[in-house]
């Protein structure tokens, strides 16, 4: 344990003993009521809302008074005060214990209202008693102020009393810490036989205060935020006290918010009174909205009174927002008192918050993880309650008595002589104002300010500050768990400044801070302090457990709290939207979208708080709010500094967002390193474009994949099915062509005509294709899909695929035949047909060419262009030449005339003749066309040739199988072009060895492998702007395979050797890199890569290019030299 903690523990023990001793010496009920009155004086002196503050101050002062005396000036003292709070917590625990009773009272229909009213009534009565006592002990001005405040309250009650009274009564116990304690007070007051008349008065006042809910929703939210901030960062003691009270009850958060805002106006009580009415409505309104949205969440998060109230009585949550309003009025009084004694009050408030939290947690059903710690406080509280049972009504009065006196004296002294302190605080306040203005300068156009008129300035600043404060508390909360004492000090200073400064802007700032720090944050901090107080050894463990418990409870309670928040928030939205409903919804949606990323990473506390709110507004689902704590903290800081309102603020005060806030995402200002880092982290989260470095790419795998893709493993069954379908189609074509030919019985019916020749052509093509398909099918059945992979290349590199194109086909005829056909054109018709076959799937037939129309000189020309795609280098294309002779019978016409004269042709005779002749022409033998084929084609094969890669470069090919008496000359002319589908490319720096004036030098070059050449430049940018310095043509390479250079000759690492040959020139001479042999100049190229991997990659790609060149363009390159 560090020495600082040990000091705190020692001081805590001493204070505890002192407090217990003083408590034993104190009177019971009467002095406690006096204490309450004194506390009420303090808030009255500072704030206009005295009555609510009395209750809240009683709670706050209960713990802090002893601790404040000791630790009013020290932040450490506050931590110790938290420990000292245990005795105070006993009282506050009592108050919390009554809060469970308050749920019991609430079930009673009339009693709920009366009790809730009784709470303010008891507070009012106590305040009145306190007023009289204050007159005795303090300046009469305080009493006068309290009376004025009470009168003003009555006026508000008379003006604002509405149907909200029952709600207020219901809310009162839950929302404010004072109210949380107040419901127990009514019970206690009942137990103590509190007069009915007094109850009635208090009920009326409570109803009036509750009726303010509609007007005070936004201000109430602000108060909530104020409490949250002190709870989180413990920056201001007021806020810490209010935060603690907020822990006890979400209403207490409201009270603290009001308290903080009023504390700012403490310097001028009258002004504060007048402004408190307006602020009460505005601040309470914001508080109510924030508490509505926040307080349930806070109660859930902190697992304090709000949570316990939810578990005990679900009505308490709705009540919470209203009671915070009431308590918010009373809190200003406490704020005033605390502002006078800022350090002591901050400590007191913080201690109270901690105690109340512990009490609430002990009573809270959801605080299971914190239970052992809470049980300890509960036991102590029970002991104190046994010692002073009369405390029930005044609760904290006895504890406050000794400390309260000192605090009151300090407050009066501060009122009388606040020159030095006041000036210092004013300076601080001015600085805070400047910061608030800077942080919220984009929110100047808030709808809040426009609506509230006179308070527009204060409201704008408040909203601005709320926006910033929401972020700052989160940031502060980050460091709260680590250094609790420091946040406490910050809070105290901040709260002191606003307390002394009567301007509403500091109020808004403090409120904003409290609001921002969300109850969960406060709870975490307070619980940590409590754990420190309770035990020194298990302190760290308890901290962790408490935090975990809180998080779990927040998640569990989000459902219940979200429901309540939705109900409460609906009213706020109705009030806030009015004419701006549509614009606000659009703004909220736009803001939600723009800030969704930022708000996703809110603190755990803010997550729990915002989840229900997000559900209400429909911004983001609670699940989306979950994120790691680091991200939450970072994003929180960024969102805090951004001018646009956060989710929390937006939901509470939807109207407070200006139109400019829509584009606020673009103007996010990064005030801190955290914000910058979070932004940078967000950027890294986005999917970045991965830059592929070619030199590190494994080309072998790609090449293998590419090569294996062509002999793809097609499903055998599917392939066989396709072949069968194609065979059936060809069978149909064969049958139809045969039937057509059978009809050509004479010249009148197409015999010897072009149609008959076309039918013969179709029959020939279909028959040949069917035969090829059957052969392919049989191969598939016998050999399977591995047939194509049998001829695997011997070398390591697979040659690339290519395309083959055949064009300009010419078929020369014999000169004698050409002359005879010209002389006797009517003797016969000669038709020629060329079929190109490259497997069963690639079969193309040229159109019919006859000597009458296609003869060009002594050769027949065919315009067909045949192209094969994606063929390997071992392709084979079969060329087959067919001819058909249609001889004309000169006596045919005479015979036809005779028959027509002798016998008329009737349909019956025609049918008989066709049948007879078709039977004559039909073939009895099995036809290649299939079983259903009637006949075979009359085309005869007169020549054939097989083309391969070796045929490339030739245009004249000798036909095989040419008959001796054929009309063909025996040759065929065609153009064959092969194109390699090689896309091997590489770019990178290589160091090339060159001869410079007889000396070897290595020069770094930017080399590009494209096509068959390696081109190199000095810089990469020169590739597109300049001609290359030099080229190495791989077609001239004589190296059988490119390999690493021999280290005996080249000592440079990662070097490979490339030997090229070119014809010798006259000016060639031998150098270090080139030698002349016979008529050739041999150049040895050494290229060095930066790494071994790069060298291997270059070698692989160069070898691939060489393979493709040598296989596809054998005549275009030199034959390799060396061992095969």
From Swiss-Prot:
Chain positions with Phosphotyrosine modification: 671
Signal peptide from the UniProt entry: none
Function: Required for cytokinesis. Essential for the structural integrity of the cleavage furrow and for completion of cleavage furrow ingression. Plays a role in bleb assembly during metaphase and anaphase of mitosis. May play a significant role in podocyte cell migration.
Organism: Homo sapiens
Membrane-spanning ranges: none
N-acetylmethionine: modified positions: 1
Compositionally biased spans, kind Polar residues: 77-96, 294-305
Entry-annotated residues carrying N6-acetyllysine: 371
Gene: ANLN
GO biological process: actomyosin contractile ring assembly; hematopoietic progenitor cell differentiation; mitotic cytokinesis; podocyte cell migration; positive regulation of bleb assembly; regulation of exit from mitosis; septin ring assembly; septin ring organization
Protein name from the UniProt record: Anillin
Chain positions of cross-link Glycyl lysine isopeptide (Lys-Gly) (interchain with G-Cter in SUMO1): 254
């Amino acid at each position: 344990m560090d020495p600082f903690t040990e000091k705190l523990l020692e001081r805590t023990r001493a204070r505890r003993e002192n407090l217990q001793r003083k408590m034993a010496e104190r009177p019971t009920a009467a002095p406690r009521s006096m204490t309450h009155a004194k506390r009420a004086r303090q808030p009255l002196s500072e704030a206009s809302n005295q009555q609510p503050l009395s209750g809240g101050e009683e709670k706050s002062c209960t713990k802090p008074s002893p601790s404040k005396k000791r630790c009013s000036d020290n932040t450490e003292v506050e931590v110790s005060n938290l420990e000292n709070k245990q005795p105070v917590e006993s009282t506050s625990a009592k108050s919390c214990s009554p809060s469970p009773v308050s749920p019991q009272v609430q079930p009673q229909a009339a009693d709920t209202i009366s009790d809730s009213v009784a709470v303010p009534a008891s507070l009012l009565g106590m305040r009145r008693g306190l007023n009289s006592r204050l007159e005795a002990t303090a300046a009469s001005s305080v009493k006068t102020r309290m009376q004025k405040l009470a009168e003003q309250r009555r006026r508000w009650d008379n003006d604002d009393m509405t149907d909200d009274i029952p709600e207020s009564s219901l809310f009162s116990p839950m929302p404010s810490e004072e109210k949380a304690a107040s419901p127990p007070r009514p019970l206690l007051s009942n137990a103590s036989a509190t007069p009915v008349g007094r109850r009635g008065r208090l009920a009326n006042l409570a109803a009036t205060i509750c009726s303010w809910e509609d007007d005070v929703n936004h201000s109430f939210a602000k108060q909530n935020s104020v409490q949250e901030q002190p709870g989180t960062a413990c920056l201001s003691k007021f806020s810490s006290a209010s935060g603690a009270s907020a822990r006890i009850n979400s209403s207490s958060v409201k009270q603290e918010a009001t308290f903080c805002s009023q504390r700012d106006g403490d310097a001028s009580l009258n002004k504060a009174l007048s402004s408190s009415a307006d602020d009460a409505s505005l601040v309470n309104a914001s508080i109510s909205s924030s508490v509505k949205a926040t307080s349930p969440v806070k109660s859930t998060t902190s697992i304090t009174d709000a949570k316990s109230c939810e578990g005990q009585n679900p009505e308490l949550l709705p009540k919470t927002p209203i009671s915070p309003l009431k308590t918010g009025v009373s809190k200003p009084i406490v704020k005033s008192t605390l502002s006078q004694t800022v350090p002591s009050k901050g400590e007191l408030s913080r201690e109270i918050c901690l105690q109340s939290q512990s009490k609430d947690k002990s009573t809270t059903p959801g605080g299971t993880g914190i239970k052992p710690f809470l049980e300890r406080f509960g036991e102590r509280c029970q002991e104190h309650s046994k010692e002073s049972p009369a405390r029930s009504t005044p609760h904290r009065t006895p504890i406050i008595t000794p400390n309260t006196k000192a605090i009151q004296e300090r407050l009066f002294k501060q009122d009388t002589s606040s020159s030095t302190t006041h000036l210092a605080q004013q300076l601080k306040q001015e600085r805070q104002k400047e910061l608030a203005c800077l942080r919220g300068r984009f929110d100047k156009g808030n709808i809040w300010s426009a609506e509230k008129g006179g308070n527009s300035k204060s409201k704008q600043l408040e909203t601005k500050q709320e926006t910033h404060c929401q972020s700052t508390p989160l940031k502060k909360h980050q460091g709260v768990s680590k250094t609790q004492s420091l946040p406490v000090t910050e809070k105290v200073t901040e709260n002191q400044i606003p307390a002394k400064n009567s301007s509403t802007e500091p109020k808004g700032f403090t409120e904003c801070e409290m609001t921002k720090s969300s109850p969960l944050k406060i709870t975490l901090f307070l619980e940590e302090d409590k754990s420190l107080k309770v035990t020194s050894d298990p302190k760290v463990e308890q901290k962790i457990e408490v935090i975990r418990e809180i998080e779990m409870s927040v998640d569990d309670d989000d459902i219940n709290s979200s429901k309540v928040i939705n109900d409460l928030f609906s009213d706020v939205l109705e009030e806030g939207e009015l004419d701006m409903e549509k614009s606000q919804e659009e703004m909220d949606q736009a803001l939600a979208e723009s800030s969704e990323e930022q708000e996703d990473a809110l603190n755990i506390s803010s997550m729990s708080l915002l989840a229900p709110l997000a559900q209400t507004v429909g911004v983001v689902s609670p699940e989306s709010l979950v994120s790691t704590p680091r991200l939450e903290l970072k994003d929180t800081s960024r969102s805090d500094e951004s001018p646009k309102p956060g989710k929390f603020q937006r939901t509470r005060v939807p109207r407070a967002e200006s139109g400019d806030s829509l584009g606020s995402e673009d103007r996010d200002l990064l005030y801190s390193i955290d914000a910058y880092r979070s932004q940078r982290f967000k950027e890294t989260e986005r999917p970045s474009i991965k830059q592929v470095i070619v030199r590190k790419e494994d080309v072998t795998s790609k090449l293998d994949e590419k090569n294996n893709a062509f002999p793809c493993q097609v499903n055998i069954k599917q392939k066989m099915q396709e072949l069968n379908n194609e065979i059936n189609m060809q069978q149909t074509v064969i049958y139809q062509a045969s039937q057509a030919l059978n009809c050509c019985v004479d010249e009148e019916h197409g015999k010897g005509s072009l149609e008959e020749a076309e039918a013969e052509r179709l029959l020939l093509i279909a028959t040949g294709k069917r035969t090829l398909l059957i052969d392919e099918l049989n191969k598939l059945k016998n050999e399977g899909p591995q047939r194509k992979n049998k001829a695997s290349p011997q070398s390591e590199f697979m040659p690339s695929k290519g395309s083959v194109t055949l064009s300009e086909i010419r078929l020369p005829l014999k000169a004698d035949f050409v002359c005879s056909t010209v002389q006797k054109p009517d003797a016969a018709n000669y038709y020629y047909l060329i079929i190109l076959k490259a497997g069963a799937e690639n079969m193309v037939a040229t159109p019919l060419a006859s000597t009458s129309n296609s003869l060009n000189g002594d050769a027949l020309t065919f315009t067909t262009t045949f192209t094969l795609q994606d063929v390997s280098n071992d392709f084979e294309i079969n060329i087959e030449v067919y001819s058909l002779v249609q001889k004309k019978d000169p006596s045919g016409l005479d015979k036809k005339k005779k028959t027509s004269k002798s016998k008329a042709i009737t349909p019956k005779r025609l049918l008989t003749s066709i049948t007879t002749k078709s039977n004559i022409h039909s073939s009895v033998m099995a036809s290649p066309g299939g079983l259903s084929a009637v006949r075979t084609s009359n085309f005869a094969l007169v020549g054939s040739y097989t083309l391969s890669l070796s045929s490339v470069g030739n245009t004249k090919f000798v036909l095989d199988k040419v008959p001796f008496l054929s009309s063909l000359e025996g040759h065929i002319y065609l153009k064959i072009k092969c194109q390699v589908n090689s896309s091997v490319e590489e770019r990178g720096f290589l160091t090339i060895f060159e001869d410079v004036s007889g000396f070897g030098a290595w020069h770094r070059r930017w080399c590009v492998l494209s096509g068959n050449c390696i081109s190199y430049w000095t810089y990469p940018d020169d590739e597109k702007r300049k001609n290359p310095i030099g080229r190495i043509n791989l077609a001239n390479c004589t190296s059988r395979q490119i390999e690493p250079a021999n280290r005996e000759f080249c000592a440079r690492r990662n070097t490979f050797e490339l030997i090229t040959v070119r014809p010798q020139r006259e000016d060639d001479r031998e150098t270090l890199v080139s030698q002349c042999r016979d008529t050739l100049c041999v150049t040895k190229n050494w290229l060095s890569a930066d790494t071994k991997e790069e060298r291997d990659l270059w070698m692989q790609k160069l070898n691939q290019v060489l393979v493709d060149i040598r296989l596809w363009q054998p005549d275009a390159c030199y034959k390799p030299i060396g061992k095969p």
